[in-house]
Amino acid sequence: MEEFKRYLELDRSQQHDFVYPLIFQEYIYALAHDHGLTRSIFLENIGYDNKFSLLIVKHLITQMYQQNHFLFSANDSNQNLFFGHNTNLYSQMILEGFVAVVEIPFSLFSLEGKEIVKSQNLRSIHSIFPFLEDKFSHLNYVLDILIPHSIHLEISVQTLRYWVKDASSLYLLRFFLHMYWNWNSLITPKKSSFDFSKRNQRLFLFLYNFHICEYESIFVFLRKQSSHLRSISSGTFLERRYFYGKIEHFLEVFTKDFQVILWLFKDPFIHYVRYQGKYILASKGTSLLMNKWKSYLVNFWQCYFYMWSQPGRIHINQLSKHSPDFLGYLSSVRLNPSMVRSQMLENSFLIGNAIKKFDTIVPIIPMIGSLSKAKFCNVLGHPISKPVWADLSDSDIIDRFGRIYRNLSHYHSGSSKKTSLYRIKYIXXXXXXXTLARKHKITVRAFLKRLGSELLEEFFTGEEQVFSLTFPSSTSQGLYRRRIWYLDIVCINDLASHE
């Protein structure tokens, strides 16, 4: 327990009490808007000297506090002028400058070499594919979990105040979130809320990433602790300020709901992977152990983050019977039976042996759905032309379609069966031919007859050429059986995400 207390006790160097004054510095807005540091953003066309920028920002913030945002709508964009300028425009600038300011404390940790997340096991996408290759076949169950979102934006502010000890900055953040909350209400147009979220993606991305960072720092720390993690130890999930008082409350809730204290034994084979607002816990344990982890996680979210993570958002799947959709792949572990004849003296007998084999398959139906949304084919997978590209040159059109196929083929190079990529290649090649035919106002057949199919083939064979250069002795048939993970993949392909 003392170790938990030392971990949850914040370092004084992490408390930043003077973040708010940075909002009044002009260079913050220059950094936030990528303007030169010598340009004045607020004083351009106003006529004041640079020394008055602090006064202008202060007046703008004061006026923003005095607005009635319940009566605010998207049609007010030309009203509420200040110094002859749109106050809403300047409030947007202040918000972006504020986001740049609150990111500073966390950037300092990177510059100083400090780690907010105390774990050596959080890695990039580069380690996920070898994890699938080496570890997945030895596991039995997987928990497929949707990361819950805050039911109220105030929870994000409460979590952030552990790191930014600045009441003024947090109050300003509450104001912006309150403005968003009102724009998202029923009495205002939905377009206003959408526009606010779209213009301030950096703010919400920061809050979401901080939310995930705080969650992982505690979850992974607790995961690595005692050999027997009893449910009574879950008091460490609770708010740092009310550590001891909340333990009793948690035990009452837990005892009331479950009547018995469950034990969660340390599972040395558990693996944690987060991606696309989800995460998985893959384990070699039994179904009972996975159900205990499920209860553990539900209480973790509810008691520490005050989020009701419904058990229905956590799915327990047995890998031998279920193929989870993971990073654009259908991953499965199947038994590959084999018979071995053994002979001892004059007696011979057959020995049955089942070897686990890990398979990654390209999900063709979701892939076609993604291509259909991008207007490369219809819902049935029939290629269609791309009218918006018809004004480009022939080489640019072919190169764009070819790049789409090469990127998808490159991303799914780790698939054990690549026959589905032939379908993707057909869609991209036929859609390129249809677009070119549309541009030249002739039929696809006439276009291919005039130029020949070789023109398209040279743009759609880049991936096979890479394979042949890497493995000169490989045959064409062997290329589509070989599983290769490329380390230059830095993110999930948009068309492969199926989101």
UniProtKB/Swiss-Prot annotation:
Compartments reported by the entry: Plastid, Chloroplast
One example of a Gene Ontology biological process annotation: tRNA processing
Keywords: Chloroplast, mRNA processing, Plastid, RNA-binding, tRNA processing
Main location group: plastid
GO MF: RNA binding
Cellular component terms (Gene Ontology): chloroplast
Pfam families (alphabetical): Intron_maturas2, MatK_N
Highest taxon of source: Eukaryota
Family: Belongs to the intron maturase 2 family. MatK subfamily.
Function: Usually encoded in the trnK tRNA gene intron. Probably assists in splicing its own and other chloroplast group II introns.
Identification of the protein by name: Maturase K
Annotated source species: Camellia sasanqua (Christmas camellia)
